[in-house]
């Protein structure tokens, strides 16, 4: 029986364009920064994940009650965003989301002057938020808080009259844990012509 032989010769040069999926974390940060900038820095190539779609709807539909479902990033970022934008809104989510604590972020925003009330249980969503210009410009947090709390606060810094200085302190503070997220925030701010120093 005759055997067929095939010889495959690779090309000397391979040229291709690859579209990588965008991080939902970066997409959600970019959406908040764009919203604070009144749409002058529109993000491109956004993630198509559920969290990002929830964020887009929340920022564009203008509803008084915002349901972020199970999107934890959206809950934290929007809580800070709604605190500095005019209007009274309620932000809620799934039953599981309403069991996830958010008191550290709410306390920090209140310290800056935000008007936030718990709808049902102290320390947990849903939240009723009256957005306004915040007068505070400096805050200290323990070093073991969620990096998303840090990002949520830093992202609204440019919306504060005198900017924001955020101190992270305590024996539980490990800069290496937060540096990648802060670097991501700083990169997005730089693209949006916002000043950041560390």
Where in the sequence are the language-model features?
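Structural preference for solvent-exposed beta-strand-turn elements
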Residues: 2-198
